[in-house]
Amino acid sequence: MEIIKNINTGQLKEIISNRYPYLLIDFALEIVPGVRAKAYKNMSANEWFFAVHFPEEPMMPGMLQVEAMLQTLSLTVLSLRENQGGQIRCCSADKIRLKKHVVPGMRLDIEAELVSYENGVAKGSVIGRIGNEEACSAQFTFEVKS
């Protein structure tokens, strides 16, 4: 089983098509193509969304947390050789849970597991944590376009 470790932002851009300001993961700790991925997003006070999402009490918008989870899950499929250079299209996001505010200075650790991948359609589940506490979670179905 192939395991890809310590993937920096530049290397992430070779796998997924998202770019600043919409690349919402900073680093992938591990990708097991077709199985799982672990990544994180550091919450710098300079993130563009903190200036507009409750400036007096900045927090990462929930939908950007959802996007960060989807980007992490997409690594499991886009890292497969046959999908290199491909893109995804989200078909559904289910059981979305936003349990904890994600604020400047925190690190959102994201773990994604691919549940199935058949005929270009992937399904998986993702959990985002701050420390040991669950901050967000969701299940996704998406289509892969090579």
Go through the PLM ranges and name each one.
Residues 2-4, 34, 103-106, 113-146:
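HotDog/MaoC-like acyl-thioester-processing domains
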Residues 2-6, 72-109, 137-143:
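Hydrophobic beta-strand-centered segment that forms part of the acyl-chain substrate-binding groove
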Residues 3-29:
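Flexible, low-complexity linker/boundary loops enriched in proline and small hydrophobic residues
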Residues 13, 56-57, 97-100:
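Beta-strand-rich interaction surfaces with strong enrichment in secreted/lumenal proteins
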Residues 20-60:
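Catalytic strand-loop segment that frames the active site of acyl-thioester-processing enzymes
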Residues 22-24, 108, 122:
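Hydrophobic core residues within well-ordered beta-strands of beta-rich domains
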Residues 26-29, 94, 99, 113-115:
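Conserved positions in beta-strands of structured domains
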Residues 28, 60-83:
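Active-site helix/loop of acyl-thioester processing domains in fatty-acid/polyketide metabolism
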